[in-house]
Amino acid sequence: MEYNDILIAPVLTEKSTELREQGKYVFKVAPKATKIQIKEAVRRLFNVKVTDCTVVNVRGKTKRLRYKEGKTSSWKKATVKLAKGETIKIFEGA
């Protein structure tokens, strides 16, 4: 799996913005990606040192549209903690 295929998108929410102050960054990642692959992808793509990585599988929610019920897709969320003093520039401009 390529490094660009592992990290799909950054997660920009109020909670993830607060975590940034602690040196933690949140990404939407590929469903089959492992913690080791995620750490390596962040290290290679952003040239930072990763100290910790936690992963959560987010279940899809049931939604209704008029008379039909549907379900949003499930996805995988990774929270990556960087070494002290390290930052990812792409988040600082957001």
UniProtKB/Swiss-Prot annotation:
InterPro entries hit by this protein: Nucleotide-bd_a/b_plait_sf (IPR012677), Ribosomal_uL23-like (IPR013025), Ribosomal_uL23/eL15/eS24_sf (IPR012678), Ribosomal_uL23_CS (IPR001014)
Keyword Ribosomal protein among record annotations: yes
Q: Name one GO molecular function term.
A: structural constituent of ribosome
Q: Which GO terms describe its cellular component?
A: ribonucleoprotein complex; ribosome
* Subunit and interaction comment: Part of the 50S ribosomal subunit. Contacts protein L29, and trigger factor when it is bound to the ribosome.
Q: Which family does it belong to?
A: Belongs to the universal ribosomal protein uL23 family.
Function per UniProt: One of the early assembly proteins it binds 23S rRNA. One of the proteins that surrounds the polypeptide exit tunnel on the outside of the ribosome. Forms the main docking site for trigger factor binding to the ribosome.
**By what name is this protein known?**
Large ribosomal subunit protein uL23
What gene name does this entry carry?
rplW
